[in-house]
Amino acid sequence: MKKFSIVKHARIFFSITAVVLIVGIVSMFARGFNLGIDFTGGSILDIKFDQPVTVAQVRTVLSDHQLGSSVIQLGSSDQQVESSQSVLIRTGLISDSQRVDVMNDLSNRLGHNEVLRVENVGATVGGDLVKSAVGAVVLSWVLMIIYITIRFELRFALAAIVALIIDVMVTLTWFSVLHLEIDSSFVAALLTVVGYSVNGTIVVFDRIRENLHTHRRNESMGDLVDASIWQTMTRSVYTTLTTLFAVVAIFLFGGETIHNFSFAMLVGFCSGFYTSTFLAGSMWLFFRKKLKR
């Protein structure tokens, strides 16, 4: 039985990718990103009350201090609750005197509370973190281009980097469309996705290179790429599934603090499988035709 030709249907896979990327780009320009205080600067107050309080009660107090737009999170897990003793408040950057006034007002109106954690991130620090995050991702791409060029050749490297850029863009698309918060852990997730995705792509490229040594003149390069992809398909599927099992478990049971981190990896790993399986080989063929020796 003849196997499905991935190369011959490359336009379909690239069209799907293009639609997703267009949606993402529109969302990025229209809605932007929900940047956490790691990037924008701000304050985090982790408070525990003696009695359960609601979001509305806390927001009413904060509104009197011009902090009504603050993000208020109840509890310490993903479980949605109407009231809780544990409250996490994310605001714009406030001074120590403002914080003391807010805490005193919360105590007077909602009961005694204990401050478990206070974090302040200045706007300058947040801006520096954005530059560092972008620099880290770009540096990883540059190093991979150098490594793959040495290990294989430039055409393989270019195809791999385009696949990685797509993976990063797809992950950013989901976070923009769903308006999920992007913090420093998101950068770590992106770098993890880049490393995982390039690993899957390298496996396919390594098989293509091996098959080139036994390539028959009457066999088209498209058939060779298809054969290489299918020869590595079982490995790719098993590796992706076993990795996703762990990531899904973290996503479901890991708690609020790493929820977005695990979601970024979940999206990125799925995209990595898609690009390495359905796009990378066809992109190598494209660069092979354009950059003939």
From Swiss-Prot:
The entry's function note states: Part of the Sec protein translocase complex. Interacts with the SecYEG preprotein conducting channel. SecDF uses the proton motive force (PMF) to complete protein translocation after the ATP-dependent function of SecA.
Q: Where are the transmembrane segments?
A: 10-30, 130-150, 158-178, 185-205, 244-264, 267-287
**Originating species:** Acidaminococcus fermentans (strain ATCC 25085 / DSM 20731 / CCUG 9996 / CIP 106432 / VR4)
Membrane topology of this protein? Multi-pass membrane protein
Keywords assigned: Cell membrane, Membrane, Protein transport, Translocation, Transmembrane, Transmembrane helix, Transport
- Respond yes or no to whether keyword Hydrolase is given for this record: no
Question: In which compartments does the protein localize?
Answer: Cell membrane
The similarity annotation says:
Belongs to the SecD/SecF family. SecF subfamily.
Family matches, as InterPro entries: SecD/SecF_arch_bac (IPR022813), SecD/SecF_bac (IPR022645), SecD/SecF_CS (IPR022646), SecD_SecF_C (IPR048634), SecD_SecF_C_bact (IPR055344), SecF_bac (IPR005665)
Share what the entry says about its subunit structure, partners included: Forms a complex with SecD. Part of the essential Sec protein translocation apparatus which comprises SecA, SecYEG and auxiliary proteins SecDF. Other proteins may also be involved.
Q: Name one GO cellular component term.
A: plasma membrane
Predominantly, its location class is membrane
| Superkingdom field | Bacteria
Q: Which cysteines are joined by disulfide bonds?
A: none
Q: Give GO terms: molecular function aspect only.
A: protein-transporting ATPase activity
- Its protein name is Protein translocase subunit SecF
Question: HAMAP family recorded for this chain?
Answer: SecF_B (MF_01464_B)
* GO BP term, pick one: protein targeting
